[in-house]
């Protein structure tokens, strides 16, 4: 069972996701968008378009409202990207159960973890291929 040891700091990055989980379908819609952004971040990076990312994260925070900030949105998205990368590095024996246990340890809400898990296994070969090409 190759669990991924995710850093404790992700719990702080995922605080916004806990708030979104409590918002029901609207919160899940934001989470799905965050997952798409994390996917893009893994495959193309974020540094090249940092100014665009900053505006996008700020706009998302405005739509979410409450205590959401551009920094909290950025932290959540990049935290999700970190999860995707670390799980891809875990290898082919990494299972859905391993994914769920690994993400539970850093406080990712169960419904969001299940969605991210399905997304990960749908795109795992893309992530592994990208890592192989970029991390020689």
What kind of region is each of these model predictions?
Residues 1-136:
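Positively charged, low-complexity terminal tracts
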